[in-house]
């Protein structure tokens, strides 16, 4: 398994996921704060191939479905993944805040358009 730290927006995101990767003894690919998350995903997929890893988990930044620029970033991430493996992604998870109530359904619909769930 290999982790791709694609949350390049939140200040402590890299440190947090690196901590868990170390605790779990899992390889990780990360970049600098503010880097292109799709580039990190590409690097993670390439690293997984070269290291013989068959599972890659890409952790992306949280985002609101109403922020079009962030949804476009997610679409770019999806295109990069598909170029690496036409059948990917094999699984996609959307984690939502439980307090959103019925708004989470609309959020899932919008996310599904940008990155199939």
Stretches with model-predicted labels:
Residues 1-117:
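P-loop/Walker A NTP-binding module and the surrounding RecA-like catalytic core of P-loop NTPases
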């Amino acid at each position: 398994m290999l982790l791709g730290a694609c949350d390049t927006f939140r200040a402590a995101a890299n440190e947090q996921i690196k901590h868990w990767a170390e605790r779990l003894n899992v390889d990780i690919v990360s970049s600098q704060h503010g880097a292109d998350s799709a580039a990190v995903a590409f690097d993670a997929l390439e690293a997984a191939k070269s290291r013989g890893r068959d599972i890659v988990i890409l952790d992306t930044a949280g985002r609101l479905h109403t922020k079009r620029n962030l949804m476009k970033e997610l679409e770019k991430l999806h295109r990069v993944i598909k170029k690496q493996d036409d059948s990917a992604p094999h699984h996609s998870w959307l984690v939502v805040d439980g307090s959103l109530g019925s708004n989470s359904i609309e959020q899932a619909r919008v996310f599904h358009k940008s990155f199939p769930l």
